[in-house]
């Protein structure tokens, strides 16, 4: 493929509006262009990478018997009314009317559409299981689209759906997809973790996310590719390393997910779902007499603890939330934070919101800093499990400026139930007891769900089972964010190339280091001077030979300066660059391996073998 025939509009500088490195490099290297806020055009290079990603997915899904189809993006609202999501999905849903004033949506996901198709065609357990998927454009009216392809209004997604007559069949397919996703992300070269996750608006029970880890800013060597005349990072002056660290610091760590994983164990979960083991508070072994004490001006846990000269672990804080139409009181250990996802899931609420200070004062006669569970009537109280283990706690007295000491559950106040409501902290013990918990940031690249009968029951997608009974099908759904996967790959494979000039000066620049299986082309042939007949003849000869060996080759046939060509080649990020320069008449070329920075000068007859050896 001739570069002069392709649309690769590289930029000399990073775009000023980019906040993450993947967005900046996709724009600068000519992979994508923004059409409007949250909407991008995938230019030829990006499209080639996306096609390779799709083909990897197709190969892996063939192995588990998943069949590809294509559903419409313009969907009737009636199906979403059947499932109940038309009213509850929120403002992210694109809603529109046709000329007859009928309601339609642009599909953000296709559970309703697929279930409608299946219920019309399958009525017996004998035709199950069914496992289908599509790779198609989705739409979501993001309030604040940002970070390039990571959070857009239009995006490419692989969404799969399976239908089953029994739980064992659903469990088997769910596991097949988990293994399939792991193979796909491994083939993409990603550092990722499968984690326990919240099902969110999708509904259902079991759910796992696949997160590409993005927060490694400490290991500088990971980011650097050194030129052939630099043998070690130790050769680079501290001043240059500081500049590189400063350059890294310009870019936000991509990914809105915080994951929790066990260092030294297998446990991993989204921060919203993570649990831990914790030691009971053993400051007291027996209950002491309840005592009301003045705490003037002490409103926060820190202030109360300091005033009473006690540890925060000895305090219980009281929160008040609206859960749908009900007011709920929540108790937490003083130094813990409420996990609102856990609370929502436990209550089965469609909506929760913290009560205002005015509402609390009107209802209980005290402000938050002095609120406590003792004496509360006609209100539901639930508490985190950790609260049950606290003896002789300090709690608010429901009178401003006062607290109770030595408050004990069962004697002084009642709780409807103790459940896991807290957000875990780093350093706590993994729930399986294997390792301590660590936090990391990452990008969600895949999500699988066991939906059960969430959609099939609502939409009357029933079958006759082996006993002739009419039952709702069981359902699973399985998504991969294909376009955001492209960004995740760049977040992990962006590199800073460091070179030492003949004058012993150190320079560095950003480049892309695509994994071999995903690069838009395998090899970049760069003739330095397109007016040099010997160079162009050798270029044509090498192109033909390499293509004959199955390599995908991009030839830079542009009449540009060598510096421009090399800069663009570094930006584009193909695994191998072959430079055809002044020694072309002798059949000598230069080979550069992108991943290592290694450069060798060889005879043309050694090119194929050299590439195979150096690329391993």
Swiss-Prot record:
It holds the Pfam family tRNA_edit. The gene is proS. It catalyses: tRNA(Pro) + L-proline + ATP = L-prolyl-tRNA(Pro) + AMP + diphosphate. GO terms for biological process: prolyl-tRNA aminoacylation. InterPro entries: aa-tRNA-synt_IIb, aa-tRNA-synth_II, aa-tRNA-synth_II/BPL/LPL, Anticodon-bd, Anticodon-bd_dom_sf, Pro-tRNA-ligase_IIa, Pro-tRNA-synth_IIa_bac-type, Pro-tRNA-Synthase_IIa_type1. One of its GO terms (cellular component) is cytosol. Consists of three domains: the N-terminal catalytic domain, the editing domain and the C-terminal anticodon-binding domain. Homodimer. Keywords: Aminoacyl-tRNA synthetase, ATP-binding, Cytoplasm, Ligase, Nucleotide-binding, Protein biosynthesis. It is an enzyme of class 6 (ligase). It is found in: Cytoplasm. This is Proline--tRNA ligase. Catalyzes the attachment of proline to tRNA(Pro) in a two-step reaction: proline is first activated by ATP to form Pro-AMP and then transferred to the acceptor end of tRNA(Pro). As ProRS can inadvertently accommodate and process non-cognate amino acids such as alanine and cysteine, to avoid such errors it has two additional distinct editing activities against alanine. One activity is designated as 'pretransfer' editing and involves the tRNA(Pro)-independent hydrolysis of activated Ala-AMP. PROSITE patterns: AA_TRNA_LIGASE_II (PS50862). The lineage of its organism: Bacteria, Bacillati, Bacillota, Bacilli, Lactobacillales. Belongs to the class-II aminoacyl-tRNA synthetase family. ProS type 1 subfamily. Its main location: cytoplasm.
């Amino acid at each position: 493929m001739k570069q002069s025939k392709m649309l690769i509009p590289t930029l000399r500088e990073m775009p000023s509006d980019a906040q993450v490195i993947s967005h900046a490099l996709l724009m600068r290297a000519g992979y994508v262009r923004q059409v409007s806020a949250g909407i991008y055009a995938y230019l030829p290079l990006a499209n080639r990478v996306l096609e390779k990603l799709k083909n990897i997915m197709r190969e892996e899904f063939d192995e588990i018997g998943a069949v590809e189809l294509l559903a419409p993006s313009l969907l009737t609202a009636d199906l979403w009314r059947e499932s109940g999501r038309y009213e509850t999905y929120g403002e992210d849903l694109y809603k529109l009317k046709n000329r007859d004033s009928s309601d339609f949506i642009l599909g953000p996901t296709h559970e309703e559409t697929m279930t409608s198709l299946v219920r019309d065609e399958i009525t017996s357990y004998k035709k199950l299981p069914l496992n289908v998927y599509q790779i198609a454009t989705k739409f979501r009216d993001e309030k604040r689209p940002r970070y390039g392809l990571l959070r857009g209004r239009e995006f490419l997604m692989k969404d799969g759906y399976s239908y089953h007559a029994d739980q064992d069949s659903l469990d088997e397919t769910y596991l097949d997809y988990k293994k399939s996703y792991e193979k796909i992300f491994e083939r993409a070269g990603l550092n990722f973790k499968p984690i326990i996750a919240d099902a969110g608006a999708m509904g259902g029970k079991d759910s796992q996310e696949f997160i590409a880890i993005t927060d490694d800013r400490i290991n500088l060597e990971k980011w650097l590719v050194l030129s052939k005349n630099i043998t070690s990072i130790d050769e680079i002056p501290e001043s240059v390393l500081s500049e590189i660290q400063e350059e890294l610091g310009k870019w936000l760590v991509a990914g809105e997910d915080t994951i929790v994983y066990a260092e030294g164990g297998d446990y991993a979960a989204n921060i919203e779902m993570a649990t831990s083991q914790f030691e009971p508070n053993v400051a007291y072994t027996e209950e002491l007499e309840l005592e009301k004490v003045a705490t003037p001006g002490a409103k926060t846990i820190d202030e109360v603890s300091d005033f009473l000269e006690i540890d925060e672990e000895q305090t219980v804080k009281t929160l008040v939330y609206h859960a749908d139409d009900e007011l709920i009181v929540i108790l937490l250990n003083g130094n813990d934070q409420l996990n609102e996802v856990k609370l929502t899931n436990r209550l089965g609420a469609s909506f929760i919101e913290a009560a205002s200070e005015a509402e609390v004062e009107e209802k209980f006669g005290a402000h938050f800093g002095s609120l406590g569970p003792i004496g509360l009537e006609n209100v539901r109280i639930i508490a985190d499990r950790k609260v049950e283990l606290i003896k002789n706690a300090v709690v608010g007295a429901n009178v401003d400026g006062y607290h109770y000491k030595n408050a004990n559950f069962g004697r002084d106040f009642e709780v409807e139930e103790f459940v896991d409501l807290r957000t875990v902290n780093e350093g706590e013990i993994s729930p399986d007891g294997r390792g301590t918990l660590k936090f990391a940031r990452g990008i969600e690249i895949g999500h699988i769900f066991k939906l059960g009968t969430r959609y099939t029951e609502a939409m009357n997608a029933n079958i006759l089972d082996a006993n002739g009974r009419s039952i709702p099908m069981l359902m699973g759904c399985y998504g991969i964010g294909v376009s955001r996967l492209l960004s995740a790959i760049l977040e992990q494979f962006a590199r800073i190339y460091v070179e030492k000039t003949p004058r012993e000066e150190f320079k560095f620049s950003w480049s892309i280091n695509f994994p071999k299986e995903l690069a838009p082309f395998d090899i970049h042939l760069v003739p330095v001077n397109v007016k040099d007949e010997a160079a162009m003849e050798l270029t044509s000869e090498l192109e033909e030979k390499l293509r004959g060996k199955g390599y995908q080759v991009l030839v830079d046939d542009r009449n540009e300066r060598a510096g421009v060509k090399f800069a663009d080649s570094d930006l584009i990020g193909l695994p191998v660059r072959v430079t055809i320069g002044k020694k072309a008449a002798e059949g000598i070329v230069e080979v550069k391996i992108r991943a290592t920075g290694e450069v060798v000068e060889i005879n043309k007859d050694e090119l194929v073998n050299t590439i195979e050896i150096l690329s391993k």
